[in-house]
Amino acid sequence: MQEQYNPSEIEALVQKHWHDTKTFEVTEDQNKEKFYCLSMFPYPSGRLHMGHVRNYTIGDVVARFQRLQGKNVLQPIGWDSFGLPAENAAINNKTAPAPWTYQNIEYMKNQLKLLGFGYDWSREIATCTPEYYRWEQWFFTKLYEKGLVYKKTASVNWCPNDETVLANEQVQDGCCWRCDTPVEQKEIPQWFIKITAYAEELLNDIDTLDGWPEQVKTMQRNWIGRSEGVEMTFGVAGSDKSFDIYTTRPDTLMGVTYVAIAAGHPLAEIAAQTNPELAAFIDECKNSTTSEAELATMEKRGVATGLYAIHPITGKQVPIWAANFVLMNYGTGAVMSVPGHDQRDYEFAKKYHLPIEAVIKPAEGDLDISEAAYTEKGILFNSGEFDGLDFDGAFNVIANKLVAEGKGKRQVNYRLRDWGVSRQRYWGAPIPMVTLADGTVIPTPEDQLPVILPEDVVMDGIQSPIKADKEWAKTQVNGQDALRETDTFDTFMESSWYYARYCSPQAEQMLDPTKANYWLPVDQYIGGIEHACMHLLYFRFFHKLLRDAGLVNTNEPAKQLLTQGMVLADAFYYTNDKGARVWVSPLDVATTEKDDKGRITKAIDKDGNELVYTGMCKMSKSKNNGIDPQVMVEKYGADTVRLFMMFASPPELTLEWQESGVEGAHRFIKRLWKLASEYVAQDNSEALDVSKLTSEQKALRREVHKTIAKVTDDIGRRQMFNTAVAAVMELMNHLQKAPQTTGQDRAIIGEALSAVVRLLYPIIPHVSFTLWNELGNTNSIEDSQWPVVDESALVEDSKLIVVQVNGKVRAKITVAADADQASVEALGMADEQVIKYLDGVTVRKVIYVPGKLLSIVAN
């Protein structure tokens, strides 16, 4: 065996072996327990970053561990390859999105292979290929036939100069990224999928996701946002019109002093016809890109409509205001305002001098609304017949009264909105709907699927090529002229079902149910927590749609979810002559000075610029602190990068990139290599004979088997890969100090090395593969079994007992593991150090903690 560890050489050889033998290609095997391990697939941006490497290393560790447990392990990979970045890159590089995307896929595929990930490449998918999206289109038409798809107008960002729709990312400071024209809001028809039809099931089934992080489950519960309340009808004074309001706090109904409606509400539109100030306000609101998230921080503004609402119980008239904090697409577009008991309503009322009435008081103590609203639940007062009721009592009595009088109804509402899947972009899957000459809209017939996106296009940066090309939209359906839909799907569509397509990627149907039901659900899913409320919710929703279409037979797509933390790196900049910050890569920092706590106090780059150190932050292009994985692999080898990624931090927490830590990981692998090299060079013919072992040899063997037990639990159950690595490192310290003099010495080292290379195989597979062969094994490590703990090796022949005299440690004695108290006392009392402290005193009491402590009290 080579004495020196040469990563580039062994990694190339091992990767060639995996490729030639198709090691990780799997098929369904009913006689083996399956394990489906999946990491969220990458967008082919051009190069892998360290966040990818962490995600995929975790997945590979889990997959390889499960393989050595004897399971039939599927670990596929593919490309989430539609999306806006490809359009922008195509414009900048004067090419089309397709060649840019396919070129990136090839480059990144090579990077993944260099890192040694054990993927079944025969199942590779790219979502931008017709072979993939044809089934997405087919499924959409089936959802339409089921009544789960509909079209309605919805607001988009509109550039009036270019006459085009802009993605949110293309709006910069309220203006078009390209021509700097102020962006307007425009209502256009768009397609929606009724995720709200599954809101209750999506919410209830969160309770079945035992293997998902609580944080993700809480985020999804809040996003779905179930609430119980009352929908009630307010009349409009002086007319026969009325409008509905939903509230979760009917107990505050008697404190309503005004009503706020959205600028787009029909009543506001009517009032604006004779109110120029209101008309201007409505136009301003229409052209703002306010999202629900921004409402909390924006300035609350409004205009009185001149209309009055009639209170459904008292009949009192209260003014109706148009307000910028009410959204037409959320709820009914109108809210009852109770400034005494809602802080937003309170601030608005103060600003516009509207009355504030208190109708709820605390059960104990005084009520004070001079500075802020009282928002807690309490006891009703100033509420007529409802005085003295608490929240629950008032909710029921007021709801019952409104229902009895035909002015309201109890209602369960969800914060969740239906999923708008239309995008006015080019690089996405065409939506398979057509409009006939008579205006009828129907799905594209199945025999005309897929609706293929043309790839040979020119991007002008203004309009989607399939919108600009009037000929592309023209088609025929059943002999009639028709026009294709020119919108494309939201790219979350592709990532909502890719996990299922991996089960049968070549199937001439959406899924092969037999194969899908063998592999699904995913046993371990890995990805960032930033996907909690979008991808991970659509992922769950789509699985239920697939179930109801008879394609899968389970309720949820993934049993376990691991959300890995971000990768951080040092960030440095200097200010140039123009006063702009120039961010410098950590790799270009020539010298640093640190304080006694190891914090960087001074840094200079290769060009001599004195740098400002801003601390550790997420690797990003904007701060130029990303570390190219390929550079690290070329310098240290893939196994070193993988080992550092697993050792530096628990998987859910952020990982701080430190090249000193990478160097430490590299040194550890070299130590392992050296130990194996020394062992292989000796005569190792003597087999292990447990009956011949000395106490020292038994102690070393005990450490080996304790480590096997710990690493098995750390990787398999706890998923604490960092502590698993630490345990092996600790064992290596023992092994390096151990003698290799006798045949039994070497037999224990041999047993230990056999275990260590398998324990580390999921993390450093190239080194483990090579050392396994060098240790004389005839089978491949991939076909071996995970090491098993020898329980008898864990049994200790002796125990170390601490002896105290009057609470102070005076000696440590070794006793037989099964020694009784009398034997331990006799040995303890006979110890020379203990005798010294018992001279001239009387022993009053002896306390024995079995296997640990002998405490002598004397005076």
From Swiss-Prot:
Q: Where is this motif: 'KMSKS' region?
A: 618-622
Positions of ATP binding: 621
Q: Sorted alphabetically, which Pfam families does this protein's record hold? A: Anticodon_1, tRNA-synt_1, tRNA-synt_1_2, tRNA-synt_1g
Catalysis: reaction(s) = tRNA(Leu) + L-leucine + ATP = L-leucyl-tRNA(Leu) + AMP + diphosphate
Motif residue range(s): 'HIGH' region:
42-52
Q: Which GO terms describe its biological process?
A: leucyl-tRNA aminoacylation
UniProt EC number: 6.1.1.4
Q: Which GO terms describe its molecular function?
A: aminoacyl-tRNA deacylase activity; ATP binding; leucine-tRNA ligase activity
What superkingdom heads the lineage? Answer: Bacteria
Q: Which GO terms describe its cellular component?
A: cytosol
| Compartments in which it is found | Cytoplasm
What are the alphabetically sorted keywords of the record? Aminoacyl-tRNA synthetase, ATP-binding, Cytoplasm, Ligase, Nucleotide-binding, Protein biosynthesis
Looking up InterPro entries in the UniProt record yields: aa-tRNA-synth_I_CS, aa-tRNA-synth_Ia, Leu-tRNA-ligase, Leu_tRNA-synth_edit, M/V/L/I-tRNA-synth_anticd-bd, Methionyl/Leucyl_tRNA_Synth, Rossmann-like_a/b/a_fold, tRNAsynth_Ia_anticodon-bd
Predominant location category: cytoplasm
Q: Which family does it belong to?
A: Belongs to the class-I aminoacyl-tRNA synthetase family.
Which PANTHER family does this one have? LEUCINE--TRNA LIGASE, MITOCHONDRIAL, LEUCYL-TRNA SYNTHETASE
Name recorded for this polypeptide? Leucine--tRNA ligase
List the source organism: Shewanella oneidensis (strain ATCC 700550 / JCM 31522 / CIP 106686 / LMG 19005 / NCIMB 14063 / MR-1)
Taxonomic path = Bacteria, Pseudomonadati, Pseudomonadota, Gammaproteobacteria, Alteromonadales
